[in-house]
């Protein structure tokens, strides 16, 4: 086992306690269908479940958002993003929130990408049974989930990258992506980022063929769909977000970028503020921006 893995796990245990307290203090939005714990791989693993949310009484096909939760690649589950996803569903979307196996032990980064592609593929095949407009599918991810979003978009567009991970085009064409306070570069000198690399890639991380995927600058292309990116005054990944902005400028990729400088209760907005508290004024502002950005990319024709 990597020497720092137990330390990282202890840190995430503390985060789990804080998340549990946060979730217990929040009231779930009402008026929404909540189909929970759908297996996208039938192996009995909690890591291979997803949830689907959409407004009750829906009579037409809705644009789709697929959400990938964050948690430093080693922590998290779809439930920590539940209220965020429900608030997006309130804005007129069908939202699918996915689990994936967490890094550590024998589980590596490529296993996680494989899981996410399995979830995408399941959605592409099965959303026809739900009020989903498969012509208008969007992707969202926060923190490590933002990194996963960048990587999976790149892989979905590139057959050689698909071969690296042993996956195929998933059947979904993402019209736009929301990267919320995303991790972007784990390789440049930065202890907070670098400490994760051996957990994700194993002992041979320096020679791993997956190493390049830990720096979005090595996989980004002009084919990327439009992105919404946000950060905040108290976001510890702010510099990473600005790096992504610079990459989009370099590659002429359409994007909307918002660095939130607002304060709430006299304090700076923190990392993934609109995910952990989608009920706050700033959280709702950011999530409304995401919804509006996605709606601006909606195509008229629907897939059956």
Regions found by a protein language model. Give the residues of each.
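Alpha/beta-hydrolase superfamily serine-hydrolase fold, recognizing
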Residues: 1-304
């Amino acid at each position: 086992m990597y020497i720092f893995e137990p330390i990282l796990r202890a840190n995430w245990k503390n985060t789990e306690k804080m998340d549990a307290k946060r979730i217990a203090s929040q009231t779930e939005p009402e008026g929404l269908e909540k189909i929970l714990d759908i297996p996208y791989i039938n192996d009995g693993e909690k890591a291979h479940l997803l949830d689907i949310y959409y407004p009750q009484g829906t009579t037409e096909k809705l644009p789709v958002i697929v959400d990938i939760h964050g948690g430093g690649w080693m922590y998290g589950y779809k439930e920590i993003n539940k209220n965020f996803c429900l608030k997006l569903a309130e804005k007129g979307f069908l939202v699918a929130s996915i689990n994936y196996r967490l890094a550590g032990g024998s589980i590596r980064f490529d296993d996680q990408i494989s899981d996410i592609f399995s979830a995408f593929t399941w959605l592409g095949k099965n959303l026809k049974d739900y009020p989903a407009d498969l012509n208008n599918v969007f992707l969202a991810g926060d923190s490590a989930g933002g990194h996963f979003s960048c990587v999976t978009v790149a892989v979905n567009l590139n057959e050689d990258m698909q071969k690296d991970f042993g996956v195929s085009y998933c059947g979904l064409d993402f019209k736009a992506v929301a990267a919320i306070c995303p991790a972007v570069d784990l390789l440049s000198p930065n202890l907070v980022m670098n400490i994760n690399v051996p957990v994700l890639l194993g002992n041979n991380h320096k020679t791993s063929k997956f190493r390049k995927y830990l720096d979005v600058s090595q996989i980004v292309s002009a084919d990327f769909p439009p992105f919404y990116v946000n950060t905040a005054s108290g976001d510890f990944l702010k510099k990473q977000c600005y790096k992504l902005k610079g990459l989009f400028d370099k590659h002429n990729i359409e994007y909307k970028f918002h660095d939130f400088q607002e304060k709430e209760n006299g304090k700076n907005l923190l990392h993934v503020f609109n995910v952990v508290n989608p009920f706050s004024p700033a959280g709702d502002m950011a999530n409304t921006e995401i919804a509006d950005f996605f709606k601006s990319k909606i195509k008229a024709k629907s897939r059956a």
